[in-house]
């Protein structure tokens, strides 16, 4: 690999090439949350639009882009460790470029290049669209380009995207967060919440469905707050905007499953629950972050709700959606957490009956109020409580899953999903409630089962973190997404919507069905 040159072909965009005249290859490595996964799809779309091609497996790419996370300390260590390993690779391949973006880049800024001088580009959460230009500038100037801006330049939706999946897609409803949780660094890195126009969101959903996608997940740091700060000044504040958006998704023909993440218990309202219950394609799944079952700790976290309020939400959801699967996030070892506080968390876990829980040991993040609290807990105390919580939650998970033995479930077949699938000869899929099911691909099958197809199976065995269905496939429905998966084709979405106060940029016309759905929201 040698230094790149830029070749301008007549009538074409500028294409990055190696000295040998080959188009440059890229790889995007993603750390962190679903937001980062979706941002990485935008990065891939940007790079391919600029002329790069995805690097084949088991090859050294000409460009490696890290989309980073800053929520936990081990994310920092993981990134800098990986960058250290790449130093020798880059020395052997002088034309190689390395770019670091995302939340950790937004946080560390110049520190990234100080710790890893062989990095070529550092960009933040607010200017991912600048990456191709920064890469060219770094190559031309033969020095690192660090560009971090303090506010969002444009919604990521005005950038092209190359999707990871042929059958399931992410769609952002907002960027940023207005909450001030004392443990969380995300608002300082992602900025204040700004909401997309409903019509733009639905246009993006329609564009995905038109390419075969059957499942969409609506993304936001706090989806319940959607509608409080539309970027379009012509749209009035609307606290029921999210429930209207869910109902509008129900009118899109061909969209079979809709999920969303993440809501906030303090702002979760009955109109959203009603929309979930009354809209057939909204999945009976809810991710509701608890963080702690102790009211004292919740107050210190600045979470704006208490355990009674949290449990009342779950009661209402289950009353209206009896088979809903509810998952959560829990932090163990927050500063000042006592044994009594921890027991309160265990009590809520036992009452809530979560299908699964993402449990974390508290990690102090510089720049957050909680990192400055004096009553930080010893590591061994946090570890011991974490292990006890895992035992309780795992037992709850298995008990809840046992209830499904003998039931028939519809699965959207997914790529991968089971580490032992090769050995067990099984495939994997997600039920409508989000549970992972490993199944035997035999029985009433219409040709080969592909990721993106739908099957129905009967649950024969339950484990804490997944279900098994070994009695054979009862029905198999082939899909356009399955056809696309079979040939390695994934959706691409063109720029949709408006920038922040900018003129409209390449927004496609909304399909008629989507236009009618939008009207009730706007």
Swiss-Prot record:
EC class name: transferase
Domain MTTase N-terminal: 24-140
Cofactor requirements of the protein: [4Fe-4S] cluster
Amino-acid positions noted as binding [4Fe-4S] cluster 2 in the UniProt annotation, renumbered to this chain: 177, 181, 184
Cofactor binding summary note: Binds 2 [4Fe-4S] clusters. One cluster is coordinated with 3 cysteines and an exchangeable S-adenosyl-L-methionine.
Gene Ontology CC terms: cytosol
Keywords, sorted A to Z: 4Fe-4S, Cytoplasm, Iron, Iron-sulfur, Metal-binding, S-adenosyl-L-methionine, Transferase, tRNA processing
This protein's name: tRNA-2-methylthio-N(6)-dimethylallyladenosine synthase
Lineage: Bacteria, Bacillati, Actinomycetota, Actinomycetes, Mycobacteriales
């Amino acid at each position: 690999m040698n230094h790149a040159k830029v070749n301008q072909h007549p009538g074409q965009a500028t294409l990055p090439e190696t000295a040998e005249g080959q188009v440059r290859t890229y790889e995007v490595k993603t750390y962190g949350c679903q937001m980062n996964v979706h941002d990485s799809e935008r990065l891939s779309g940007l790079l391919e639009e600029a002329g790069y091609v995805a690097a084949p497996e088991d090859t050294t790419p000409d460009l490696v882009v890290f989309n980073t996370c800053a929520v936990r300390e081990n994310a920092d260590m993981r990134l800098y460790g990986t960058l250290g390993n790449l130093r020798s690779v880059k020395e052997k391949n002088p034309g190689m470029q390395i770019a670091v973006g995302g939340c950790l880049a937004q946080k560390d800024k110049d520190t990234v290049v100080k710790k890893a001088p062989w990095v070529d580009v550092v960009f933040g959460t607010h200017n991912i669209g600048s990456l191709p230009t920064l890469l060219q500038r770094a190559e031309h100037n033969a020095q690192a380009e660090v560009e971090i801006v303090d506010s969002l330049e444009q919604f990521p939706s005005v950038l092209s995207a190359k999707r990871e999946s042929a059958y399931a897609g992410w769609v952002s409803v907002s960027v940023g967060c207005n909450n001030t949780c004392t443990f969380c660094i995300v608002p300082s890195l992602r900025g204040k919440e700004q909401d997309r126009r409903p019509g733009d969101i639905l246009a993006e959903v329609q564009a995905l469905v038109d390419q075969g996608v059957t499942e969409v997940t609506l993304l936001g740091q706090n989806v319940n707050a959607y509608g409080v700060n539309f970027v379009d000044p012509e749209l009035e504040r609307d606290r029921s905007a999210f429930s209207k958006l869910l109902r509008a998704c129900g009118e899109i023909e061909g969209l079979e499953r809709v999920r969303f993440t993440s809501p906030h218990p303090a702002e979760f309202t009955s109109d959203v629950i009603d929309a979930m219950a009354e809209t057939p394609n909204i999945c009976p799944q809810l991710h509701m972050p608890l963080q702690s079952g102790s009211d004292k700790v919740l107050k210190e976290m600045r979470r704006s709700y208490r355990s009674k309020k949290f449990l009342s939400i779950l009661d209402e959801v289950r009353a209206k959606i009896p088979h809903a699967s509810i998952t959560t996030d829990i932090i163990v070892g927050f500063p000042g957490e006592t044994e009594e506080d921890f027991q309160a968390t265990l009590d809520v876990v036992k009452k809530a009956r979560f299908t699964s829980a993402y449990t974390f040991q508290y990690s102090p993040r510089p720049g957050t109020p909680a990192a400055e609290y004096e009553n930080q807990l010893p590591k061994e105390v946090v570890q011991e409580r974490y292990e006890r919580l895992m035992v309780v939650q795992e037992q709850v998970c298995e008990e809840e899953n046992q209830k499904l033995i003998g039931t028939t479930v519809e699965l959207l077949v997914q790529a991968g999903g089971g580490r032992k699938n090769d050995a067990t000869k099984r495939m994997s899929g997600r039920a409508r409630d989000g549970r992972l099911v490993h199944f035997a691909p035999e029985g009433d099958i219409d040709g080969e089962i592909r990721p993106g197809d739908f099957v129905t199976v009967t649950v024969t065995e339950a484990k804490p973190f997944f279900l098994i269905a070994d009695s054979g496939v009862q029905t198999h429905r082939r899909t356009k997404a399955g056809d696309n998966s079979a040939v390695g084709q994934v959706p691409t979405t063109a720029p949709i919507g408006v920038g922040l106060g900018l003129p409209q940029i390449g927004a496609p016309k909304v399909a008629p069905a989507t236009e009618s759905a939008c009207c009730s929201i706007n």
